[in-house]
Amino acid sequence: GTRRRGGPDRFAELRQWTPKTRLGRMVLDGEIMTYQQALATGLPIREVEIIDALIPNLEEDVLAVNMIQRMTDSGRRVRFNVLCVVGNHDGYVGLAICKGKEVASTIQKAITKAKLDLIPVMRGNGSWESGQGPGKSVPIKVTGRSGSTRVTLMPAPAGKGLVIGDTGRRVLNKAGVTDVWSSTAGQTRTTINFAQATFNALKQLNRTRIGDQDKLKLHITRGEVGA
């Protein structure tokens, strides 16, 4: 399920935080106030407290908990595979998978890893069915792959909603994408591959070169819009 982070507890935690990296110290000293500024430094983000300080409204969603049993010489060994997505519903999303012996600690590990793998999301209005103005769809058609799973996201008009399977919907929802058409190919029943292919499509958008004129025409934004 979804959980929201924030509130007074978060600030209490941050007050007790002793940063180990240069970027962490800059955040704690108030030199860096936004995630965009943190990315612009070019410094690696290695401390999860940096994310908690700069994007306090992140929510997490555990997409899958799979039990893996193996027989060893000393008996049956049980481990868990946890897939987790985090996002602020407004242009930032992260996805991670972790393995561990206990469910609770593995979920926590996956949440931390997803926060450290956070990406800005490119959104816009690329649908010919849409009127002029900003939109929260994908600006262009884009495909992501994971294993044999392929997920293609296509611009949809405002109000269309997320026309995609439940796993993809949960990833896009956390990213702040509200309208999308999609098509899928390959093994689409595996939650992990479907989620990773959807996330990889959003990553692919960031690698796509779009001219300044098209950016204006498609009302493209990257990261948080605040609306």
Annotate each language-model stretch with its function:
Residues 1-227:
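Ribosome-associated RNA-binding proteins
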